[in-house]
């Protein structure tokens, strides 16, 4: 089982790299908390056990993993920075699910992620009591996420791409639509 800290560091590192390439704004503590919740939820739904053992609580702005919140609280609303990238104690299966969740939810604003976690009937909404920071039961998270549309896996995305019509050169390489070649007779349609 992974540690919440490894999950958080992995997500921070992924979004830091995307931000360096102008593909993301970076990770704030509030955004991290919401993404931790979604990752835990989808992992529970898919594997019937938690990705990490640390509790998730219902705070004013949505689900929070307190140990992770405290670790990064010094950043306030600023972009999180962590130590230099390290090896993460995560399996390839865990990393893949985290990447799939980031692919689905990482594109949304923090405000929208907060709204999603506040959906009526969602685990946060069932236990939230202002100022109480009540624990959100793992079983309720699992039940809720089993009713949600599954995140597309990397494997499914590759399969979807492979089913599209494209040209393949005689040597087997794929010719993408924007490629232009003078002698199309050398190529076969797949």
Role assignments for model-derived ranges:
Residues 1-190:
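Domain-edge interaction signal
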